[in-house]
Design a protein with these regions (language model features):
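Phosphate-binding site of ATP-dependent enzymes
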Residues: 185-272, 299-301
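Glycine-rich phosphate/pyrophosphate-binding beta-alpha loops
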Residues: 85, 181, 236-239, 306-320
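ATP-binding N-terminal substructure of ATP-dependent carboxylate-amine bond-forming enzymes
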Residues: 1-110, 114-120, 139-155
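Active-site nucleotide/adenylate-binding loops and adjacent lid/helix of ATP-dependent enzymes
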Residues: 1-7, 11, 19, 73, ...
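Hydrophobic beta-strand scaffold residues
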Residues: 35, 103-104, 132, 171, ...
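Conserved metal-phosphate-binding beta-hairpin within the catalytic cores
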Residues: 211, 220-222, 278-311, 321
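Active-site "cap" helix and flanking loop/linker of ATP-utilizing ligase/carboxylase catalytic domains
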Residues: 235-287, 319-342
Length: 342
């Protein structure tokens, strides 16, 4: 079977994608799959890669530029888009593969784009009665002014007062369509707020502002198409105030714990809520569902779901699936099987 891995991409998570691809390529069973890799540069150019060290600076050495994308893609039996963030996890690459009529790993177009957009995902999760941390939607208009937008689309220019009144400080400012904690900032005071909002808006003109809670970060992996299975719950042990990009991929002092150090009843609730959230976006294939456990109140909140979670050797999704009995080679087999079933 001819398997194509696609990595890189134009998002801020370009480097993470390449690290994930290294791990998937290493673990894909070469007796089952003829594995090739296409790399997408930050400028959006596609290359047929020769080097297998996709995370190195020389990853394009010896590569051939791909100009006829459809013809190239249609030469494969299945595609694994190992792409995170915009132009990869947001339904765009999925739409291209749908048009080319090629089976691919992961969620389809609508689930991908909805889950990637924190603002619209929150609306769906509200409809599914899944608790979430109190939040506000801030938009940077095309005239560069910031406004708070309510559920009926009404705009308020009193951004600082709205956030201070409804959420208070500290709070978190998050670019709506960014992942791996890129464009995510903790704001401790009113004087920090506007600069951080503008910084987040550099990644996405749509921004979510959430109330900060004294939280333990918990994660659950789901897998399946019609029949969804959920892993045990894992716990993030960040080296710092919250799980930043650096904590996830660069800080060796950050750690994970499986199972999480919370009551079994909390873990059972999270596993059920993870499946519910995955179904709410009509997910297929896989996702990592992220939750907050409020240490002060005991409440559990859904943070977000990631439809193409990190696959590095330290990423939580493959760790959770290994704990569930699927090591990375077997996990790749199962994800490809699910892709071919659709």
């Amino acid at each position: 079977m001819k398997l194509l891995l696609v990595c890189g991409g134009q998002s801020t998570e370009h480097a993470v994608s390449r690290m994930s691809c290294v791990n998937i390529y290493k673990n894909a069973d070469k007796t089952k799959y003829d594995v090739k890799v296409a790399g997408i540069t930050k400028e959006g150019e596609w290359y047929d890669l020769v080097s297998t060290d996709f995370s190195s600076d020389n990853w394009l050495e010896g590569a051939t530029k791909i100009t006829d994308h459809f013809t190239f893609l249609k030469s494969f039996d299945v595609v694994f888009p190992v792409l995170h963030g915009q132009f990869g996890e947001d339904g765009t690459i999925q739409g291209l593969l749908e048009m080319a009529q090629i089976p691919y790993v992961g969620c389809r177009v609508m689930a991908s784009c909805t889950a990637m957009d924190k603002i619209y995902a929150k609306k769906l999760f509200d409809q599914a009665n899944i608790p979430q941390v109190p939040s506000l939607y801030v938009k940077k208009r095309y005239d560069d002014k910031l406004v708070v937008v309510d559920d009926e689309g009404r705009e308020s220019f009193n951004v600082e007062m709205e956030i201070y009144t409804h959420l208070g400080f500290p709070c978190f400012v998050k670019a709506s369509r960014s992942g791996s904690s890129v464009g995510c900032y903790k704001v401790n005071s009113l004087t920090e707020l506007l600069p951080r909002l503008h910084e987040a808006a550099n990644y996405d003109r749509h921004v979510v502002v959430e109330k900060a809670i004294n939280a333990t970060e918990l994660e659950c992996a789901v897998i399946g198409n019609d029949d969804i299975s959920a892993s045990r719950v894992g716990q993030i042990l960040p080296h710092g105030e919250f799980y930043t990009y650096e904590s996830k991929y660069e800080d060796e002092q950050s750690a994970t714990c499986i199972p999480a150090k919370v009551d079994q009843s909390i873990q059972d609730y999270i596993r059920q809520a993870a499946v519910k959230a995955f179904k709410a976006v009509d997910g297929t294939g896989l996702a990592r569902c992220d939750f907050f456990y409020d240490n002060d109140t005991g409440n559990v909140y859904l943070n977000e779901i990631n439809t193409m979670p990190g696959f590095t050797n330290i990423s939580m999704y493959p760790q959770l699936m290994k704990d569930a009995g699927l090591d990375t080679p077997a996990l790749i087999d199962e994800l490809i099987k699910l892709a071919l079933q659709r």
